[in-house]
Structures are given as C-alpha cells and as structure tokens.
Amino acid sequence: MSTYTRPVMLLLCGLLLLTLAIAVLNTLVPLWLAQANLPTWQVGMVSSSYFTGNLVGTLFTGYLIKRIGFNRSYYLASLIFAAGCVGLGGMVGFWSWMSWRFIAGIGCAMIWVVVESALMCSGTSHNRGRLLAAYMMAYYMGTFLGQLLVSKVSGELLHVLPWVTGMILAGILPLLFTRIVNQQTQARHSSSISAMLKLRQARLGVNGCIISGIVLGSLYGLMPLYLKHQGMANASIGFWMAVLVSAGILGQWPMGRLADKFGRLLVLRVQVFVVILGSIAMLTQAAMAPALFILGAAGFTLYPVAMAWACEKVEHHQLVAMNQALLLSYTVGSLLGPSFAAMLMQNYSDNLLFIMIASVSFIYLLMLLRNAGQTPNPVAHI
C-alpha cells in the first residue's frame, strides 16, 4: 500500500493553501495594527489572543471529529478561519481585532488537529514518520511561500483580505474530492486529553513536543532580534531566517525515513544531540551558515518524530485524543519558551537564547538516555 495515498495528497494540498493564508496574516496583522498607531502592548495582546484561540481550538476538536468526522470538521475549521479573516476588514480596533484573531486562532488549531489526526489514523508503524515529514514539509513550504507573497504583493488591508479569504476557501476544495474515514467512531470508549498526557509510556513523546515548542518558538520569535542585535540589516536577517527554515524543510523527509527504518528512539537522540551542537556552534559565531543549518534541520524535525513516538504508544481509537494532547503540549512550549528566553536576553545576554535551547535539549536527552532500558521502540497498532 502506498504511503502517499490520494486522500493524503489532497489533504496536504489543502493544508498548503491554508498555511499560505496563515503565514500572510501572521506577518501582516502586526504591521496593520502598527500603522493604525496602536501601542505595542495592544499589538502583543492581539497576537496573544490568536495563540489563546489555538489552545481553545485544540481542546474541543477531538470531540468534533468524533461527532461529524474528519471531512466536515475540516470544512468547519476552514470556514471559522475564513470568518476570522473577513472580520478584520470591518474596523481596525483593539477589541474587534482581538476577537477576530481569537476566532482565527480557533480555526487554525482545528485545521492542525484534523490534518495531523487524519494522517496518524491513515498511517502505520512503517510509514507514520514519512507521513508526518510530508505534513511538516507542506506546512513549512506554505510558510515560506507566504513570506514570499508578502514581499511581492500590495500589503494594504483591503487588497490582501479578499485574496487571502479566497485562498482559505480554495483550501476546502481538495477534500471535496475524497473522504477520510474516521475509524475512531467504531471504538466503544473515547479517550480524553488529560488521560493521554498522563500516559506513562507516551511521556517521552509528550515531553518531546514541549521541548520542540520551546526550541521552535524561541528560534522563530527571537532569532531575528538576536541577528538585529548583531548589527545585521533586515535583508541579511531575512537571508539567515530563510537558511534556518530551508534547513527545516530539507530535513523533514530524511528524518522521517530514518525514523521509520531505525526507530524513533535513536533518531530522537541524534536530533536532540545535534540541536545541542548547533546551539553551541552559534555561541562561538565561527561558522553561522552550518550552525544555523544543522540547528534548523534537527530542531524543525523534532516535533513530527516525537509525535510519531507518542502516537504509536496508544490504540488506534486513541490517536485523535493523543494528537490533541501533543499539539497542546507543543503550543504550551511555544508560548513559554520565547517568554522566558526574551526575559533572559533582555536582562543578561543575547547568547542566553542558545544556552537555554541547549539546556532544555540536554534535559530531554537525559530523559531519552535514562529510559533506554525500559522504553523500546514503539510498535504501532495497525
């Protein structure tokens, strides 16, 4: 059976279009607010409302999938996201935009839960790594193309919203031509997110998603600031961020393939060790290109491998709940990491960004090594 079936390919095509829209809005919304002369703290609050929406959307999507299935949940999530986009055109104001970005955050989180859960339910122990690698490649490629679009088209609010909304609605079209079966509805008992978080045998995967959130959130949010403080121009900062993201895209498929072939545990250990090496190399400032490349290749691929580990520790009917727990863990890490790192950078030194990344990665590496004797490579439930 082929890994990349027709439903999988159509799902990833839809995700690519939706991610393009997400990337464009996430870049332009803060700029639109700044042009409207809103104070910085209000811009930050609007951004926080989006991530709060992510948390809320993550919590109830599993129940929605169980009730109405993958396809209808995907349509509903896309429509909620589109509503959050259209609402921005009404009036530029703090309270209104905070509300609309909260709604958009709910829709985006629902999309991620639906897509990730559908891929996990479609896969087996032999191909889940490659499926999640393809998912991350589509996500980062959409992010990259979204940034490219921002630099090429008009950034005016009323010029952007129509075609971004159209792109969101176009993201629904691929799934109109296929049906993703939800086998979870056949199970007698449903699982809760809290039960998945407490599952001892999946704890390494959950912890890996938290660490991944800390690492990626810190790199995405604070690497441009770090480079700015090194005296770089905006063009140079854009180049180095492109190197970082490109490394993450290029590393997805090889890491997924290696995880399927040699086991998640070995690949997780190597990834975390390489993140530590990349962080140390960034501190030396001797060779930024290779340091950023290996940091991106290892750091950006940690999440899908940790996900595959945790999901192979549960029964098939528990996959949606486990995926919710993992996305929630990643979101919490991506919120806490940048906040703590920014505080360290402001009060002490910019180098503490990489010291923090290396430190949390080292703690996770110790967990992976400590559990070597009692945590064998997981066997999937097919």
Swiss-Prot record:
It is a multi-pass membrane protein. CDD domains: MFS_YcaD_like. GO terms for cellular component: plasma membrane. The keyword Ion transport does not apply. The chain crosses the membrane at residues 8-28, 45-65, 75-95, 102-122, 131-151, 157-177, 204-224, 231-251, 270-290, 291-311, 325-345, 349-369. Keywords: Cell inner membrane, Cell membrane, Membrane, Transmembrane, Transmembrane helix, Transport. The keyword Transport applies. Its main location: membrane. It comes from Salmonella dublin (strain CT_02021853). It comes from the Bacteria. This is Uncharacterized MFS-type transporter YcaD. Belongs to the major facilitator superfamily. YcaD (TC 2.A.1.26) family. One of its GO terms (molecular function) is transmembrane transporter activity. It is found in: Cell inner membrane. PROSITE patterns: MFS. It holds the Pfam family MFS_1.
